């Protein structure tokens, strides 16, 4: 089976969130399951530099306002997965964030930049740009690639099944409806039952309306987005798709996230030999300027600093941690950036509590590994969370997660209760309402458990024993691909 993945990011070349981690690991797992997999990616500077053995496949010419568009085929340098790169310097040769200009606003031509990504993916699926390789399945990821589903649906030569994965429904790719003509799609699509969304053009709806099957990155999130509370205004569209929507949990790339072999941490360790984790903790405390105190539980945040991630709740719950005496009292390490108000508030907390609170307003992959290994507990208090990878990494590193019961967090963490602890099922701590009081209660529960070494040790080991592999996810995707193909063959359309 030939599968083409269309996406805007791939780890380690371009990463703004978990989408990149998925594209960095899932294709390899699918190849391991027997699929013939290729990616199609925008020719951002880091992607052009990170794809080796490039050969020109097709000179596309001037489309989407770009003076020159060339389709190249090479292999990702880090894992050898084949990847098409859309070389369009006018649209993609820009520094920094793939979506945002240096002033923090969206690039004004993002419609053309990601419309081109979808257009190329669909024309590859139609066998037009590389006649030597035509996919059986076109798998588009998030709004950046969603328009591929609309282009494929309108192309008479398309025989590929289309699958669309929602990594985060909140980011929808909304544009001025007057710019619809720039996409070159039939005008009949720009209606409320098509791509129109409250007077705007929605890339997200291209995937929701025109993909044969829709997936999200956890079973619970698949149910949540069909409700008004989590549907971001699209719950009706999602409910209308019914059984076409399913959830498949993300996995963990064991080659990247493994404390036994991680070259980025102070000392290796495993469930059988945990001594290295204490060394990682002391090293992290020294690096961040926290008091070096083996008995002090270190709570950590590795996240975008946004209200979606519930970090305003953490600020309001912080006194619950800091009211303990400094000696042996809880510490907090925060890494990430985002909302300027949250950045300022966490910076102020660090200034007010030296040795107890440390903040690094940057995303640094190596530092994220050191925090994951050195912290005792990882905080993920999200208001909504499609899957969440942070808690999966934390479990693997014996860093006990404290999470809200929502989305993929609910699917991957077993909250500590009397029953779950006695049954040796507990892997973390969980709270329900999105309130500072509920989070504070979970934090205090974690502090109390940390004071019971035998209990904490059991939580760590149970978490490290969890198996969230990409092999399992790949098996589910392969089954979905086959089922979608069979449905197409049986009906001619879905």
Curated annotation (Swiss-Prot):
One of its GO terms (cellular component) is cytosol. It is an enzyme of class 2 (transferase). The keyword Acetylation does not apply. It comes from the Bacteria. The keyword Phosphoprotein does not apply. Pfam families: Glyco_trans_1_4, Glyco_transf_5. ADP-alpha-D-glucose binds at residue 15. Its EC number is 2.4.1.21. Pathway: Glycan biosynthesis; glycogen biosynthesis. GO terms for biological process: glycogen biosynthetic process. Signal peptide: none annotated. Keywords: Glycogen biosynthesis, Glycosyltransferase, Transferase. It catalyses: [(1->4)-alpha-D-glucosyl](n) + ADP-alpha-D-glucose = [(1->4)-alpha-D-glucosyl](n+1) + ADP + H(+). GO terms for molecular function: alpha-1,4-glucan glucosyltransferase (ADP-glucose donor) activity; alpha-1,4-glucan glucosyltransferase (UDP-glucose donor) activity. Belongs to the glycosyltransferase 1 family. Bacterial/plant glycogen synthase subfamily. PANTHER family: ALPHA AMYLASE DOMAIN-CONTAINING PROTEIN, GRANULE-BOUND STARCH SYNTHASE 1, CHLOROPLASTIC/AMYLOPLASTIC. Synthesizes alpha-1,4-glucan chains using ADP-glucose. NCBIfam families: glgA, PRK00654.1-2. This is Glycogen synthase. It comes from Polaromonas naphthalenivorans (strain CJ2). The gene is glgA.
